[in-house]
């Protein structure tokens, strides 16, 4: 997929409205909501801590005010949706105590990304969101939002109202009949928004492809293929416009890096309405599994007019965003080590590794590994050189003007060379 032909993947995946007009309509609604807000209402402690950090540092305060005043690159806004950093703080504060609502044309599943969209794609914003102190403060904001989304209060959006997830339109869009739920319960039996968002498939919905054939590797996520890259380098300029993969940064310097140099990376993006749990692409033993802290709203500023599109930065974000990394030693010696990287983007950066899935744990092909909370984003699978004989047709990235078609989780991703076919 070339940079010149890419569309906004995040819009294609349903995290943001399909067009700019839809996003601006949603933003107008948020501004109308805060216009009715009690002026004496105090900010959430996490948002107040973010404010205090910026107010207490002259450089951060300068960047914060400049990124609101500057015009974003790659966006054609019809109007400003924020006039000051103080107003931006109030918009953030509203997000922390609300769950995403359903909409056929204005749905924003990543609301913090929506309200920060203007500021992220400005020169001052590039510097602001890469500052480690800002990142730490935003982690506190995201933790507060995650706490709300894991509470019973977040069930207010699981209703039959037009903007509710139990509405007929939402049920069809989600394909709810294929997921475990209690149709007779007012909230389908879910305890919170996060519980709903990390819902399980019914038994039999996603069988493991060629379960007894160790050469068949399966998809770790329900995700639309984005890119296949071969002969990847140990270190490369991942921030450049072409966004090459840099194995050392992608795996955060793990000792397994050498096994993947000159190998292959397959990347895919998750849809907002689909399944957000992860599964093992192979049977084997987990060598290491960890969550690598990273940035939350950083964008690659080498992309010119594409700079404001977060998922046009997918390759870049794979190296710098919060991500869960698994290194698995496959039972099939022809495969060897496989690395799977589950990457959070923007406000969907919560990566949860399954209980007991640390070093030494055994996993079967297709077994669950963990999940994204309050969203998900993209996944990379790394193979050593000469391991993959072919990718399945469904795993090959589509033309950007085609309707996104996800590769089912646990479906055939690739076929490894048989042992006797290994080069060397």
Regions found by a protein language model. Name each.
Residues 1-424:
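Contiguous, well-folded functional domains in the mature portion of proteins
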């Amino acid at each position: 997929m070339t940079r010149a032909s890419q569309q906004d993947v995040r819009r294609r995946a349903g995290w943001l409205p399909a067009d700019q007009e839809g996003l601006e309509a949603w933003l107008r609604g948020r501004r109308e909501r805060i216009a009715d807000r009690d002026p004496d209402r105090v900010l959430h402690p996490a948002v107040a801590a973010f404010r205090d950090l910026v107010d207490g540092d002259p450089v951060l305060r300068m960047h914060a005010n400049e990124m609101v005043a500057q015009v974003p690159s790659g966006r054609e806004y019809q109007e400003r949706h924020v006039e000051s950093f103080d107003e931006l703080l109030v918009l953030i504060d509203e997000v922390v105590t609300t769950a995403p609502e359903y909409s056929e044309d204005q749905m924003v599943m990543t609301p913090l990304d929506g309200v920060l969209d203007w500021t992220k794609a400005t020169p001052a914003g590039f510097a602001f969101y890469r500052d480690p102190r800002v990142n730490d403060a935003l982690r506190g904001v995201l933790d507060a939002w995650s706490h709300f989304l894991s509470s019973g209060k977040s069930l207010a959006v699981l209703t039959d109202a037009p903007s509710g997830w139990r509405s007929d339109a939402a049920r069809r869009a989600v394909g709810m009949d294929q997921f475990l739920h209690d149709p007779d319960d007012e909230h389908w039996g879910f305890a919170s928004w996060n519980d709903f968002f990390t819902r399980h498939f019914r038994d039999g919905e996603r069988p493991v492809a060629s379960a007894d054939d160790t050469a068949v590797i399966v998809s770790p996520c329900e995700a639309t293929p984005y890119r296949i890259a071969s002969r990847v380098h140990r270190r490369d300029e991942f921030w450049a416009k072409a966004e090459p993969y840099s194995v050392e940064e992608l795996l955060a310097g793990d000792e397994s890096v050498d096994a993947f140099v000159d190998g292959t990376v397959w990347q895919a993006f998750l849809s907002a309405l689909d399944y957000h749990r992860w599964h093992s692409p192979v049977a084997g033993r987990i060598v290491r599994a960890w969550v690598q802290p990273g940035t939350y709203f950083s964008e690659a500023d080498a992309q010119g007019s594409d700079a404001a599109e977060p998922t046009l930065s997918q390759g870049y974000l794979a190296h710098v965003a919060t991500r869960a990394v698994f290194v698995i030693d496959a039972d099939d010696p022809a495969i060897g080590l496989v690395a799977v990287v589950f990457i959070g983007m923007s406000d969907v950066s919560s990566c949860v590794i399954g209980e007991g899935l640390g070093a030494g744990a055994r996993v079967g092909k297709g077994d669950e590994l963990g999940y994204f909370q309050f969203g998900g984003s993209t996944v990379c699978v790394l193979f050593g050189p000469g391991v993959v004989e072919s990718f399945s047709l469904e795993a090959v990235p589509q033309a950007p003007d085609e309707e996104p078609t996800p590769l089912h989780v646990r479906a055939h991703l690739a076929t490894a060379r048989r042992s006797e076919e290994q080069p060397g």
